[in-house]
Amino acid sequence: MNNLTPYQQTMLATWQQHTYAEFVLKDADVALATMSENPYVLAIPSGTGGMGRIGVREFYASQFLPKIPPDFDLTSLSQTFGYDRIVEEFVIRFTHTLDMDWMLPGVRATGRRVDFALVHHPV
């Protein structure tokens, strides 16, 4: 990643802190500290999320972070950098041991393995 501009390096460091806060620490306040002053989160499968710091914190603390299975694994396959954004391709793997309405709305925990690819582009 030596070819990144200083701004892109800062974006990457912030993104890494953010995903660590989400998937390792599972800490809404630490994740929120990596976001803009007026964040917006939308979980596409369910249409849930939050707007503004209060709304995003509530979504993270009540619907998202506590509903991440303990064996959740996020593996980065590639990152593409634009001037002001990162597009990242992941493989996500977990055992469906929790109801995850933010990702699988209305699907009760099945105990089955789940593996899928995801392209994410935080704005």
Name every feature range the model reports, one short phrase each.
Residues 1-123:
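C-terminal and inter-domain tail/linker signature
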